[in-house]
Amino acid sequence: MAEQFSLSTQQRDTINTLLAIITDKVSTSVRDADLPHGLLSGLAGQLLFLYKAYEYDASLVDEALFTEKLDALQEGLDQQSFEMSNGLAGQAWLLEYLNQADPENYDPELLEEIDELFRESLDHQPWQGEIEMVLGLSGFAPYASRRAKQSDQTALYGVIVNGLESTATRFDNGHITWSQPQESVYRFNKDEPTEPEYNLGLAHGVPGIIAALLPAVQIPALKERVTTLLLGACDWLLEQQSTDCTSHSCFGSSAGGEHHSRLGWCYGDLTIAMTLARVGQQLDRPSYVERALEIGLHAAGRDEQSGHITDAGLCHGFYGMAVIYQILNQLMPHPRFVQAMQYWVDYSLRQYTERGVESLYSYNGLDKAYNEDFGFLMGYAGIGLALTSLFDDDTGWVDCLLMA
């Protein structure tokens, strides 16, 4: 019999308590704070959690407050910047997610003006801005792929593919990659901006670009071009893997550097493994899936010390670990992934038992302090989403983080 993830009665009670606490805190934040409207750290991300909390237990959520703030989000769309993190790409993703959650009342015209706005604003050849997902071009892919479930997004995805093609570095052996732009805020080496720098994180690097391109293989007019990009990029990415089997990490944070990286969504082996597995399954490349499984299983042996886990959030915290192993097990069912998910859930709930609500605080590496964070990526909202997913195995929201 396959190994199963399980929660004890006491753990279920603890999660129920946590969800009540988190819902109350996020509801207070939504009601009283002057929040930016973004998905990753603002109102949209907190509304996403409240929606899932309502599905879990409707009594936890003030429906009138949710409706009021969702209306405010929609009314403020014309005042937003465009990027995923705080801008329109993330907010519009949420609106499409909620639109699709009610199939009988789905409104196909709700976001057509946003489609056109993005098509026009992103159509620059060659692309000159950021290429990663938080502030850059790859961050428009979650919206485009979510919209493509219900409408033809050939034009919008075509613009995204054009931009990423225009910035790609191609090698004679067929490998393809992307160097961080010279003016990128995410460059590690800002002193030598003309030197190529190949970031290996899902949030800011090549794995994220691969994940952003992947849904476009479902679009007939783009399939051939996108397949070429994906195969060249995955082959390049696998060449960056360490040959040192004693290292904690298979990949570093940047190509050519030391093979040391944390466990997390943002950087590290886990989301590289996830991305390779998804491409391998989509393009029928079993070798990618095999390598992904090896990388994921290697990472499953790491704990909070070797994984540099210092807080709770989705980005690189212990609740984020539970969700990532949950997704890996959905992609590549394996007892070791179930065990790793169990480990991080047990660890997370034990932290709450020992430290209370402060165990949920976000760690700020600049001032070396823990603080409350109400947001999706680093704070309460994301932790709450992770907890609801433990009960129903529904990770249908993770496409906004390029994990589906």
Give the label of every model feature segment.
Residues 152-278, 283:
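Extended ligand-binding clefts on enzyme/binding-domain cores
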Residues 24-44, 73-88, 123-136, 190-207, ...:
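Solvent-exposed loop and edge beta-strand segments that line ligand/cofactor-binding
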Residues 13-33, 64-81, 108-127, 158-176, ...:
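Long, well-ordered core segments of solenoidal/helical folds
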Residues 1-8, 45-59, 91-104, 139-152, ...:
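Well-ordered alpha-helical scaffold segments within catalytic/enzyme domains
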Residues 1-21, 152, 159, 215, ...:
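Terminal, non-catalytic domain-edge segments
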Residues 12-18, 31-65, 79, 83-90:
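N-terminal domain-start signal
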Residues 306-340, 344:
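Loop/turn-rich, solvent-exposed surfaces of beta-rich toroidal or solenoidal domains
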Residues 93-166:
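Internal, well-ordered domain-core segments that constitute the primary functional module
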